[in-house]
Design a protein with these regions (language model features):
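TOPRIM fold recognition
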Residues: 44-138
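Phosphate-handling DNA/RNA-contact segment within nucleic-acid enzymes
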Residues: 1-74, 92
Length: 138
């Protein structure tokens, strides 16, 4: 007697093929024509407490091929606000992403953050300063 599998997985397991908060914030992202990408979910929640809803999180420090497709399909400006010390220019998938959408990023040139801080960790005023000084990734 041939036994059939109990479960069949049509998608590979163990991959991160989602962006935290995207589904909940899609309307705000469309309204602003911009998505701010954080590393962690906590930053998305903190930004929301300040009334900033066009945000989502990678849940890691780099963009994988699945997330690249998701961001490219959005067709809006992507602002990377990753933790201090993460250089987006070293990420091959972010380099690919700039072929499809405008990519900007937060860079703490004035040393306002502690090591490994998210751009929102030091409060709303510092976040605003960092966001207003964001750079265009050419």
């Amino acid at each position: 007697e041939k036994k059939l599998r109990k479960y069949t997985y049509f998608k590979p397991l163990g991959i991160l093929d989602t962006i935290y908060g995207l589904a909940e914030n899609r309307d705000y992202i469309a309204l602003k024509n911009e998505i701010i990408i954080f590393e962690g979910a906590k930053s998305v929640m903190l930004a929301a407490s300040w009334g900033i809803y066009n945000t989502a999180a990678l849940l890691t420090s780099h963009v994988n091929p699945y997330q690249l497709k998701i961001l490219a399909k959005l067709g809006c400006r992507v602002v990377f606000a990753l933790d201090k010390g993460i250089n987006i220019r070293e990420d091959e998938n972010i380099k690919r992403l700039k072929r499809y959408v405008r990519v900007e990023y937060i860079w703490d040139k004035d040393d306002l953050l502690q090591e490994k801080d998210s751009p929102v960790d030091q409060g709303q005023e510092i976040w605003r300063t960092l966001y207003e000084g964001r750079l265009y990734y050419r």
